[in-house]
Design a protein with these regions (language model features):
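Alpha-helical DNA-contacting segments of helix-turn-helix folds
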Residues: 51-58, 65
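Helix-turn-helix
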Residues: 7, 11, 15-49, 53
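Amphipathic alpha-helical segments used for helix-helix packing
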Residues: 92-113
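Amphipathic alpha-helical packing segments from all-alpha helical-bundle domains
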Residues: 77, 110-135
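Hydrophobic alpha-helical connector segments
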Residues: 53, 67-92
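N-terminal intrinsically disordered/low-complexity leader segments
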Residues: 1-3
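Hydrophobic alpha-helical segments that form the core
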Residues: 138-143
């Protein structure tokens, strides 16, 4: 990814998180990122593609951060780590809620890519938690 595309993506993510998807237009993203509208549209054909790209980036970061935090923990210890990670996230000054829930809530039924990305993200989180919940006593009974 080029520096310009990365800057646009990072700026869009910050603005969407700070405000909302519907409140932030491409002109604001262009102005805040310091790129031209032509450059923005070179990398992202429309706002929906930009939103989808932001969600894909956020999903990768979310998964990596959560997996790293859980580390080698298993069973109940892993579930506790998952909750601890979320508590730390919720307590951050810039926390405004889940970007995926917000994107889905602000999208129309025609925004299938955005809705699918939000659904896939939540499904991954469900499966991630479920893998540790299958045998919750395994670790705690060995202590």
């Amino acid at each position: 990814m080029s520096k310009s595309a990365a800057k646009i993506l990072s700026t869009a993510e910050q603005l969407f998180n700070q405000h909302s998807f519907n409140a932030v237009g491409v002109d604001l993203i262009r102005d805040e990122s310091g790129c031209s509208k032509t450059t923005l549209y070179t990398y992202f054909k429309n706002k929906q593609q930009l939103v989808a790209s932001v969600l894909k980036k956020r999903d990768i970061q979310f998964r990596q951060s959560l997996c790293d935090f859980v580390g080698e923990a298993q069973s109940l210890a892993a579930i506790e780590q998952i909750f601890d990670w979320h508590v730390m996230w919720f307590q951050q000054d810039h926390f405004k809620g889940c970007l995926f829930v917000r994107a889905a809530g602000e999208s129309s039924q025609q925004d299938t890519e955005i809705l699918n990305l939000a659904k896939q993200h939540k499904h991954w989180l469900y499966e991630f938690i479920a893998q540790y919940a299958q045998h919750p006593q395994a670790t705690s009974s060995s202590h």
